[in-house]
From Swiss-Prot:
Family label: Belongs to the protein kinase superfamily. TKL Ser/Thr protein kinase family. SH2 domain-containing protein kinase subfamily.
GO cellular component, one term: cell cortex
Gene name in the database record: shkA
Keyword tags: ATP-binding, Kinase, Membrane, Nucleotide-binding, Serine/threonine-protein kinase, Transferase, Tyrosine-protein kinase
Matches recorded under Pfam families: PK_Tyr_Ser-Thr, SH2
Species the sequence originates in: Dictyostelium discoideum (Social amoeba)
Protein name (Swiss-Prot/TrEMBL): Dual specificity protein kinase shkA
Amino acid sequence: MATQQQQQQQQQQQQQIKARKDIQIQQAQSASDILGPPEISETEITTESILGDGSFGTVYKGRCRLKDVAVKVMLKQVDQKTLTDFRKEVAIMSKIFHPNIVLFLGACTSTPGKLMICTELMKGNLESLLLDPMVKLPLITRMRMAKDAALGVLWLHSSNPVFIHRDLKTSNLLVDANLTVKVCDFGLSQIKQRGENLKDGQDGAKGTPLWMAPEVLQGRLFNEKADVYSFGLVLWQIFTRQELFPEFDNFFKFVAAICEKQLRPSIPDDCPKSLKELIQKCWDPNPEVRPSFEGIVSELEEIIIDCCIPDEYGAILWKNHFKHENEANWKDFINVFSNFVGLTNANTPSMSDLLQFSPNLNGSTIELNFKCLKSIIVSSPKGPHEEEVVLMEQFGKVLAWFGNLKEDGSQILDKIRQLMECAWFHGDISTSESENRLRQKPEGTFLVRFSTSEYGAYTISKVSKNGGISHQRIHRPQGKFQVNNSKYLSVKELITGEAQALGINTPCLGSRFLSLIYKAQLSGYIN
């Protein structure tokens, strides 16, 4: 009987807790409805220089509450529909929070003729960067920018109800000081229930025609796959850095070309195959064939890996174990790497455990090999409590410098150690640092370092006859090292074979690797 009473008391307590939670949720929702978007008085906002034009007005750099902001100011003369759309944009932005969506700070919605939206201030838009030939943007950087944009739109499409952007283009993708891309300008966005299709009214299609999907241009039913079509064009411009459809100046001819002839921009021959296929899927005439943004993000992650790690098997390693990451913990990396090249397997302890606990490896060549690998592949922790990590790009560089993972396997570790045993090898130092080390040294003094301008290559820096310092590239075509039309299997063999012809005879001391090599007998566990 006592047990039944206890059960009844527990049930009553649970019901009371649930009732209190329901009341709290209702109160929170009610408060949200009452407060609405953060309202900012027009007197708190000052505008400065013009940044550009948005859907409904001009965007300025400004100040609000002692903070630099971007201020979108509505056109002074607006009709009721435009005003409604403006308030809809404010409502949408006030409910969306994501690292790849421009942060909404507040709005002035109550003063006629003074309607403004305040957002975080960005450095510029992606279109301006892409079309500026003076701005250096490596393909890896551009693909990461594409992924940022895709993550932002994925967040919109994953919401319930679904948000369709409807004006997705590179000028509506803003870039901050760290080159992080964020989606902006929700003036034309539409909300729909999942699975629902929409259709434009008598006013015609909304958005920018050059970036519109065929179904939107033709006034047919559409859904979020219209954004996917636009993103295919975004990807094309991110890769080519060219203007979109410069040959068209007639709207009706453009619509006929896109919708009837299924014309699309030409994809250059040097476009990576996986990226080309993704672009083509995105702008397919059939919306059902186009991928979701979840699929787009997944494919972009693989494309980024391929860009960072050109070595086929190195890319496979990263995709299988660290696909969603730009970096890997050092211990996790050596465990995966060791298993991948056959140094360990499912029946042996992990390499990190072997290096830490196996007395047989203390002072061994294997331990020294991993110390040498660590010295060129690990990024130093930024803080006292942060872990040592391997960056994806650095793994790609190491493979480009030292070998092919499929053919060389664990022998890559031996190649790294053998090069570090050479007193003249200084690794990843800059041109200016190499000149500092060689300054006032005798003629013929030299060092070898990684090239700072050619992927996978090396550079010989030496003191010439007149005391000047010169630099000569060691290329690596088809896996062999070449200088003066002579090819060798290793950098060490090249230096020995070409020393007289190159006028080099005395290694420049000061390599950071020498202490690592000659203190090997004192080595213990890799920290």
